[in-house]
């Protein structure tokens, strides 16, 4: 049975804490984001070493491997989006269908150790990118096609919720 696509607009996490994982963007200091990314990436290695990493807990839920592959791609996508904000004036981000990507890239058939290495590399890259943004550039903006607008700061806050939430999903 295929996974039901997630169609929620998760930008609400910028306004109130996530009741599922406890993350609170409003309480997050921008300068903490790089360390949070690195800590999150490190926590995925033991999750991916589990013998059941590719086993879905039920037909409607991704396996830990699928969540990790998604997080790897989130790190890559947000690195690209941050680069766009810093390099262009109010860029429009390309749409990304995470569910179509999971199917097309066969997340659950990927090698867990390869995903762990790729996730760590992508995390290091996006952590370094967020760390390198000077305070004067943190109000630069970008937008999604649905009209959601982000500053560098709110992009960081919105972004870090995703890997945090998914680590909670797999109880990592």
What are these regions (language model features)?
Residues 1-39:
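Terminal targeting/low-complexity segments that flank the catalytic cores of oxidoreductases
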Residues 1-15, 52-102, 138-172:
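Short, contiguous alpha-helical
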Residues 19, 29-31, 44-45, 67-69, ...:
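Short secondary-structure boundary micro-motifs
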Residues 19-23, 99-107:
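A short small-residue
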Residues 25-35, 88, 109-117:
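Solvent-exposed interaction patches of small proteins and small membrane subunits
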Residues 33-62:
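A glycine-rich, hydrophobic loop/mini-helix early in the fold
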Residues 40, 45-47, 102-140, 159:
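Acidic/histidine-rich alpha-helical segments that form the ligand environment
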């Amino acid at each position: 049975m295929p996974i039901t696509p997630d169609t929620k607009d998760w930008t609400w996490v910028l306004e109130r804490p996530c009741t599922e994982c406890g993350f609170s963007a409003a309480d997050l200091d921008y300068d903490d984001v790089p360390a949070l990314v690195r800590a999150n990436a490190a926590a995925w290695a033991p999750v991916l070493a589990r013998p059941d990493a590719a086993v879905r807990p039920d037909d409607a839920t991704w396996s830990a491997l699928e969540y990790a592959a998604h997080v790897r791609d989130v790190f890559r996508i947000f690195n690209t989006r941050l680069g766009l904000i810093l390099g262009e004036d109010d860029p429009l981000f390309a749409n990304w269908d995470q569910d179509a990507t999971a199917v097309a890239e066969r997340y659950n058939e990927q090698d867990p150790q390869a995903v762990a290495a790729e996730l760590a590399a992508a995390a290091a890259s996006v952590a370094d990118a967020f760390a390198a943004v000077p305070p004067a550039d943190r109000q630069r903006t970008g937008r999604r096609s649905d009209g959601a607008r982000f500053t560098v700061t709110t992009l960081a806050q919105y972004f870090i919720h995703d890997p945090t939430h998914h680590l909670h999903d797999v109880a990592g």
